[in-house]
């Protein structure tokens, strides 16, 4: 079996296994639903890891594999490179741990949302996991669109899960805004096909400068919608109506990561990129960064604080991708690494918030005191996640933020405007550290508050997931940097 064929088979199974699991969830009685989801996600995770291992063992050669063509028109295909083989195991593996965490969370024992989990929860979540693998591996704009739309449908179903009026409104808001953004990807794909006769993302490189700029800006517009960047951010804070495991996956390794992945793939495939694309990307990133920071300052609900934090954190990625247009490969590498690193840190933080909802019946920060004494694992997880989001060494995001900032300073040597923007980013990261340090000092030490003291025991499945994610937050920074090279 050839190298390309073996990678393709592993990629296909990684996509198909969770989706087959979602069908089995619908066909079998409810008690089996969670186990089919765990099995599908586990098989998918194993395949993405095996694919990455084979890729590394062969010397990491960039590999394009056509899957479906009509005549000379490539419709669907796979791309295996350092970026896709790094991100796919993270997105799928985190999905597996979210499913495991959901088993105790989605139960009558949940103090905030007692619920007998319906099969659709596990069906949507399993489909989401498969779609993320498909999107990361896709080598065509049409393939990206297919999985782009599947993730949108899954997010609608999961955000609306509790079926309250606010949940249904939040789900519809996410669906509408991200579909408005999808128009950019549809138009970009149409332009590429009209001028090249193929949907391959690499065909963007063959367009003239004007058309290339238009296509990349359309892709950027679609990316803003999925990744909740200004002016398309408003769906994400509302999406906190979803069950917390869903919020963790949306923010850490699925919905919001779709946008940055699509834009990064377009940039790396486009050859020489017109500077207007870089300027639009970094200016919007800076506006979003400052807006997100200012908006999470007054938040007392832990999930809403983390939602606005996600908006700001993803602006770092767009800032790094924009800097790459001006010649900084270091900034591009840092942006890709930040997608990877942030996935573990933010998933951990959201799942910690969910554990408070489960055991205490609240996630309001002013009510959370003395966490370390009552829940040592949750307290350590809170601290590790907070330090990671703030970019404190040796946590993973320190390394990726450093790459982006260093790349920005290298570009800023010859461009005062960019240098100023990089300095603003540095100031924002320092302010973020100060704000999260405040909440760490308030919530973690001391005697437990009344709410914390009366809390229920932490389920073992949650503790297991926390331990794995804490380890990954610490080790994934050097891992991603060495993989991207």
Model-derived segments and spans:
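Transmembrane helix-loop-helix hairpins at membrane boundaries of multipass inner-membrane proteins
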Residues: 1-10, 23-123, 198-206, 485
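N-terminal signal-anchor/start-transfer transmembrane helix
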Residues: 11-30, 224, 228, 289
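Short, aromatic-rich membrane-interface segments at the entry and exit
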Residues: 12, 32-38, 142-146, 278-279
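Alpha-helical transmembrane segments and their helix-start/interface "positive-inside/aromatic belt" motifs
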Residues: 30-42, 170-179, 375-381, 459-467
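Hydrophobic alpha-helical membrane-insertion segments
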Residues: 39-53, 181-187, 382-390, 468-479
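Hydrophobic transmembrane alpha-helices and their helix-loop junctions in integral membrane proteins
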Residues: 97-114, 119, 123-144, 154-445
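Cytoplasmic/organellar membrane-interface segments at the starts of transmembrane helices
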Residues: 372-379, 429, 433-485
């Amino acid at each position: 079996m050839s190298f390309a064929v073996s990678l393709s088979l592993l990629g296909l199974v990684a996509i198909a296994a969770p989706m087959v699991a979602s069908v089995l969830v619908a066909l079998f009685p409810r008690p089996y639903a969670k186990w089919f989801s765990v099995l599908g996600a586990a098989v998918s995770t194993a395949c993405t890891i095996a694919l990455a291992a084979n890729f590394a063992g062969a010397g990491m050669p960039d590999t394009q594999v056509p899957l479906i063509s009509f005549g000379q028109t490539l419709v669907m295909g796979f791309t295996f490179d350092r970026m896709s083989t790094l991100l796919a195991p993270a997105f799928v593996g985190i999905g597996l741990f979210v499913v495991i965490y959901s088993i105790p969370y989605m139960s009558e024992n949940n103090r905030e949302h007692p619920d007998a989990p319906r099969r659709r929860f596990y069906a949507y979540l399993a489909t989401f996991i498969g779609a993320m693998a498909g999107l990361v591996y896709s080598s065509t704009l049409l393939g990206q669109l297919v999985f782009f739309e599947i993730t949108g449908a899954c997010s609608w179903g999961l955000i609306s899960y509790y079926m309250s009026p606010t949940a249904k409104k939040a789900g519809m808001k996410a669906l509408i805004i991200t579909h408005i953004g999808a128009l950019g990807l549809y138009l970009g794909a149409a332009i590429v096909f009209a001028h090249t006769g193929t949907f391959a993302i690499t065909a963007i490189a063959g367009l003239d400068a004007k058309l290339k700029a238009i296509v990349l800006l359309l892709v950027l517009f679609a990316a803003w919608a999925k990744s909740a960047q200004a002016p398309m951010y408003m769906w994400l804070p509302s999406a906190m109506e979803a069950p917390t495991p869903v919020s963790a996956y949306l923010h850490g390794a699925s919905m919001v990561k779709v946008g940055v992945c699509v834009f990064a793939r377009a940039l790396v495939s486009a050859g020489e990129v017109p500077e207007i694309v870089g300027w639009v990307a970094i200016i919007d990133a800076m506006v979003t960064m400052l807006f997100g920071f200012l908006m999470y300052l007054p938040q007392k609900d832990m999930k809403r604080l983390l939602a606005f934090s996600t908006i700001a954190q993803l602006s770092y990625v767009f800032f790094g991708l924009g800097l790459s247009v001006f010649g900084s490969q270091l900034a591009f590498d840092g942006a890709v690494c930040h997608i990877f690193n942030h996935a573990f840190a933010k998933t951990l933080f959201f799942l910690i918030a969910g554990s408070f909802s489960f055991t205490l019946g609240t996630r309001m920060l002013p009510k959370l005191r003395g966490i370390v004494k009552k829940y040592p694992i949750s307290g350590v997880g809170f601290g590790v996640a907070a330090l990671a989001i703030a970019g404190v060494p040796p946590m993973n995001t320190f390394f990726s933020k450093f790459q982006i900032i260093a790349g920005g300073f290298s570009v800023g040597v010859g461009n005062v405007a960019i240098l100023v923007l990089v300095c603003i980013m540095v100031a924002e990261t320092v302010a973020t550290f100060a704000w999260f340090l405040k909440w760490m000092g308030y919530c973690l030490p001391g005697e437990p508050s009344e709410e914390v003291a009366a809390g229920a025991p932490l389920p073992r499945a949650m503790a297991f997931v926390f331990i794995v994610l804490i380890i990954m937050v610490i080790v994934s920074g050097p891992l991603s940097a060495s993989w991207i090279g």
